[in-house]
């Protein structure tokens, strides 16, 4: 099936090579789109799947691709998160090698978590980061390391990422999802289609002289998680339990889940969409969930049935 994003994205100049360090959920989507556009793509994974062309890269275990693998790379995206170390794992292991490549654009996927809690107020790229979680502070340190690297770096700050196979649809259908109500609380999100398409758009903007150091990549509509879950139920004609008050649910949450609910912010995408001219593929969760459902149903149809 042809990639529907191909016709809305401009190809990179002839002879370009895109390297994606950490081709997981988001990185694989960019790789598949770029390949569909005829762009030469190199990817790495910590543990590549059997039969995959991805190169193994695991800095924690000193598993690094050979220098020859990076020859001629013109565009690079790192999705690799910080470990518990104080330095970025990519720059620590590949920094000198990357300096030798003809790089025109380097993207680093970070998190809007670096803004911290704004009590539901809007934040832009010009607002100073106020990270409250340790994982966000590590991200912020890596952002600065990339910006100080001397490479043509652009930081892409992402909120919650979703897409086919990673959305509330399956849990809603299975009846295992319990909505939670916390008045005034919203979450921001972005579909993987928009991560991939925005990366390509930003590569072109940079080539044309528009290269802000930090760009928020998120949809137009911050919304309560229960609203998203109700829509997922409506799309599938499934019942959804009544939302449980956050004051009751908090005691049963893991520390990680509690940390997500501890921060409330609305992230602006005005720089990306109004100033840099990007048009969202999925401007809100309704568009994104509809695409997820369509793709997940197509995948179910393609799975061969097993004879009894």
Give the positions of each predicted feature.
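Substrate-positioning beta->alpha
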Residues: 164-171, 180-204
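Mid/C-terminal beta-alpha module of Rossmann-like enzyme folds, strongest
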Residues: 198, 205-257, 304-308
């Amino acid at each position: 099936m042809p990639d529907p994003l191909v016709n809305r994205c401009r190809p990179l100049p002839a002879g370009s090579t895109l390297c994606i360090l950490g081709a997981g959920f988001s990185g694989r989507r960019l790789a598949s789109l770029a390949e569909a556009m005829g762009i030469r793509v190199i990817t790495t994974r910590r543990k590549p799947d059997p039969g995959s062309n991805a190169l193994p890269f695991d800095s924690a275990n000193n598993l690094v691709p050979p220098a020859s693998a990076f020859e001629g790379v013109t565009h690079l995206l790192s999705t690799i998160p910080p470990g518990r170390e104080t330095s970025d794992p990519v720059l620590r292991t590949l920094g000198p090698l990357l300096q030798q490549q003809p790089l025109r654009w380097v993207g680093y996927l970070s998190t809007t978590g670096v803004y911290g809690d704004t009590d539901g107020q809007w934040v832009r790229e010009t607002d100073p980061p106020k990270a409250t979680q340790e994982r966000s502070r590590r991200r912020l340190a890596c952002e600065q390391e990339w910006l100080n690297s001397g490479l043509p770096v652009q930081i892409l700050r992402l909120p919650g990422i979703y897409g086919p196979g990673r959305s509330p649809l399956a849990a809603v259908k299975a009846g295992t999802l319990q909505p939670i109500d916390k008045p005034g609380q919203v979450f921001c999100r972005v579909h993987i289609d928009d991560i991939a398409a925005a990366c390509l758009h930003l590569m072109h903007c940079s080539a044309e002289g528009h290269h802000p150091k930090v760009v928020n990549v998120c949809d137009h509509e911050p919304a309560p998680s229960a609203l998203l879950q109700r829509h997922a139920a409506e799309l599938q004609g499934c019942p959804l339990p009544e939302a449980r008050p956050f004051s009751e649910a908090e005691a049963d949450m893991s520390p990680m889940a509690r940390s997500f609910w501890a921060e409330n912010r609305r992230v602006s995408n005005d720089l990306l969409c109004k100033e840099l001219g990007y048009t969202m593929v999925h401007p809100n969760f309704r568009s994104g969930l509809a695409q997820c459902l369509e793709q997940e149903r197509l995948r179910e149809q393609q799975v061969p049935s097993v004879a009894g």
